[in-house]
Amino acid sequence: MYYYKKASSYILERYADVSDREVAEKYVDQMKLNLKMFLSPEEIEAQIDLAPEGYRFVRQLVLPDGSATFLRLYNDMFVHPMEAEVSAALKRLIMEVPKVACLTGHGERDMNNVGDRDYYAFAKNPTFRYALVNNGFDVIAYRMTEGEEIPEDIRILVIADVKQPLTESELEKIDRYVARGGNLLIAGEPGRQEVMNPLVERFGVQFMPGVLVQPSRDFDPDLIRGELTKDATEMSLNYADLQKKKRVITMPGATALNYTMDKGFMVRPVLTTHDTGCWNEIETRDLLNEPVELNPVAGEKEGVYPIALALSRKMGNREQRIIVLGDADCISNSELMMYRKGIKASNFSLITESFRWLTDGEFPVNTRRPDPADTSISLELSSMKWVKVMFVGILPLLLIGCGILIWHRRRGR
């Protein structure tokens, strides 16, 4: 079906005092179309709510029982959905959809905000191919209320950059959520250790004091280039591919993670700092204007520091899983769109692989296939010289001969 509606900010500003119908009449007149082809805003809204889609072109897949889901276009070079997005849309129609809840109410990162530090891009931007909403998930903002437990249908709870301390009753609710097997993604920030450590200490994890630095000539000293570990490559074949390609995860301002395994969880580092040139800065407060120097006397030590952890434990016939990140900016709106010359970053892969692991491979759909086997060569070494003679000698002479023949015939005309 076709419809018209003022939706984009450009159109809304340009035609602020003009009705939707008048704008549509201008456009159809320019394009030599008939306005009767298009449903009015009132007619389309009576059939379907396209406001969350921004009234863009969208496909809807519908089953006979009324189940439906959207299949969108994306603002990238490929535009159309590919196998992963189509498969995710189809799976949504036939299985229980995992619900992701982003905790709010304590200054956390906002999944509905397009600001640089917030999470709209990876959570619910319909035009971003790797957003959770385009890969099979339902995503909501969730605020804990007095007297109510965390809903049973929340599969993954995201707690990112808490600025105000969680109350005892809120921590108890999270404890009960974890006790029943709920999964978590927790992201901290330098300066928030005191607020967030009471949350992660129950899992044997601690956000260490200070801020990690990796001084370089071109970038801020607190820009950490996280490297995938051997444990990460065992968790995900896609991580293994990224490691071979020397891809990194950029963290602009990260805190090191310390952990023990005495809380019942198996803990595996997913990302660590480089083994040289990186340390936990404790003294310097203004990293941009003050010199950043390693001071062993102050307890600063150069080495490898974990900056992302994967925690797991068996619960009945399934595995409970938790991801802890030492930086909340690495999956923010600005960092996902950031390009830095000389750094091959793949931060969106951290999102897709983390949530794939948290759902035990259900979503996002993994369309990776084994590399084709190419292990046999039928050509013998003794025959190589004739191949060389053919391609280096005979074939070039034939091409030259053909060129001379064509030139001679044309010259004769």
For each of these PLM feature ranges, what is it?
Residues 1-4, 103, 142-144, 210, ...:
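Conserved beta-strand termini and adjacent loop/short-helix elements that scaffold enzyme active sites
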Residues 216, 370-373:
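A glycine-rich phosphate-binding loop feature that marks nucleotide/adenosyl-phosphate handling sites
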Residues 120-363:
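Acidic, S/T/G-rich, low-cysteine, solvent-exposed domains in lumenal/extracellular/periplasmic regions
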Residues 1-127, 131, 364-367, 376-393, ...:
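Hydrophobic targeting/anchoring helices
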Residues 63-65, 73-77, 104-106, 163, ...:
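A mature extracytoplasmic/lumenal domain signature
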Residues 42, 71, 113, 147, ...:
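Generic alpha-helix detector with strongest preference for long hydrophobic helices that associate
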